[in-house]
Amino acid sequence: DTVNDATAFLETFFKLYPTATEKELAYYVSGNVLEPIGRDYLYSELINPIFTKDGENVKVKVAVKFLDNQTKATQVSQYELVLHKDSNWKIIG
């Protein structure tokens, strides 16, 4: 189902996102919607994702918990994203 699919996509994406290059991000993100983080963060979990169907797209509000490998501190970042699925999911906004 859409929510499970989108959740799995986001988990995969946020595992890669902290260390991804712009070229790698291009597979998951349309244009420059998200800038590379370029930090040694380790994905921990999605916190309370809220999905809203918006025509062909799915909007998601989510907090993402990362572990900073340098400081061992927990970092929580808020995201509001628009997802679209053709053959694969992509973050378009």
Residue map of PLM features:
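Short beta-strand edge/turn micro-motifs at domain boundaries
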Residues: 1, 78-93
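Residue-identity detector for glycine
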Residues: 6, 31, 36-38, 48-49, ...
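Surface-exposed, charged secondary-structure patches
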Residues: 42-80, 84-85
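Core segments of small alpha/beta cavity-forming domains
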Residues: 1-40
